[in-house]
Amino acid sequence: MIKGLPEKLKEQREKYHYSQKYVADQLHVSPSIISGYETGERTPSTEKLLALSYLYHCSTDYLLGRKHDDPETMI
């Protein structure tokens, strides 16, 4: 699991007052998948990460904890 991703996903979901079921319905997965993302037991695919960023109105960089000016997070 990518460090910090589970926390960011839960933080964003709660920010918009979305239930795990609502997010799961939007991504066409089960609520247990969303729970797994938020606990770090599962890692979302690139496709699901993009869908989550769209749903949460944020960039994938934000969800991944990347900062453009931070050399430690640059690939």
Q: Where are the regions that the model predicts?
A:
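Alpha-helical residues within the helix-turn-helix
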Residues: E14, D25, Y54
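A short, Lys/Arg-rich alpha-helix, primarily the initiator
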Residues: M1-K15
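DNA major-groove recognition helix of helix-turn-helix/homeodomain DNA-binding modules
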Residues: E47-Y62
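Short alpha-helical DNA-recognition segment
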Residues: H17-G36
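Short, charged recognition helix plus adjacent turn
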Residues: L64-I75
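Residue-level signal for the short linker/turn that defines the boundary of a DNA-recognition helix
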Residues: E7, H17-Y18, P44-E47
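DNA major-groove recognition helix of helix-turn-helix
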Residues: E38, K48, K67
